[in-house]
From Swiss-Prot:
It comes from Homo sapiens. It is a peripheral membrane protein. This is Dynein light chain Tctex-type protein 2. One of its GO terms (molecular function) is dynein intermediate chain binding. The lineage of its organism: Eukaryota, Metazoa, Chordata, Craniata, Vertebrata. GO terms for cellular component: cytoplasm; cytoplasmic dynein complex; membrane; microtubule. Pfam families: Tctex-1. Belongs to the dynein light chain Tctex-type family. It is found in: Cytoplasm, Cytoskeleton; Cytoplasmic granule; Membrane. Keywords: Cytoplasm, Cytoskeleton, Dynein, Membrane, Microtubule, Motor protein, Transport. May be an accessory component of axonemal dynein and cytoplasmic dynein 1. Candidate for involvement in male sterility. Residues 11-24 have a biased composition (Polar residues).
Length: 198
């Protein structure tokens, strides 16, 4: 007779002539290799790419460098270059506002010849003009100067406009240039600021 109750497992009654029934043996699953094991790295890559059209041809062997060595390599690669101080407090060539103004005015009139006002076109044209003017000003060879170029397009609708700029700078070396092009439907204004950078 079987005992049944709470917490007691029932087992089949065995007679002396019967052999005990064994539970079906389930095959043990193989342990998945860790990606941190050197030998298993290529196997993991192959498993991941098995269903794709790529085949793993070659895998670089894992490096044996310690983490501390990697950090040292990165620090040296990211270090800033240090240059010797020249102790020069003024530019070799002072900014010549008149020659730059002539060049900027020439670029402005050439670029805007026969152009009608269109706000969508002018948004891209202002960027192109600023780039062209910046390249032209850099060709003058003013070393240690940083340039800021502002290109403004104003549609003529019978309004009055006042454009003002304020700055704090060194009056001995810093300067600015303005060039204007007026058409039937708009006014174009270019401001070039040259700031000496020691």
């Amino acid at each position: 007779m079987e005992k049944r109750g709470r917490g007691v497992k029932s087992s089949p009654i065995q007679t002396p002539n019967q052999t005990p029934q064994q539970a079906p043996v389930t095959p043990r699953k193989e342990r998945r290799p860790s990606m941190f094991e050197k030998e298993a790295y290529t196997q993991i890559l192959r498993e991941r790419l098995r269903e794709s059209i790529h085949n793993v041809q070659y895998v670089e062997p894992p490096f044996d460098d310690s983490i501390a060595d990697i950090g040292k390599e990165w620090k040296s690669a990211l270090a800033k270059l240090k240059f010797a101080n020249s102790y020069r407090m003024e530019p070799l060539k002072k900014f010549q506002a008149h020659s730059v103004e002539t060049k900027v005015q020439q670029i402005l009139t050439e670029s805007l010849k026969d152009v009608k006002y269109d706000d969508k076109v002018f948004s891209h044209l202002s960027l192109e003009l600023a780039d062209r003017i910046l390249l032209a000003v850099k060709e003058f060879g003013y070393h240690r100067y940083k340039f800021i170029i502002k290109v403004l397009f104003i549609q003529k609708t019978g309004q009055a406009i006042n454009i003002a700029s304020r700055w704090i700078w060194d009056i001995a070396w810093d300067s600015w240039v303005a060039a204007k092009h007026e058409a039937e439907s708009y006014v174009a204004l270019v401001l070039v600021f040259a700031l000496y950078y020691e």
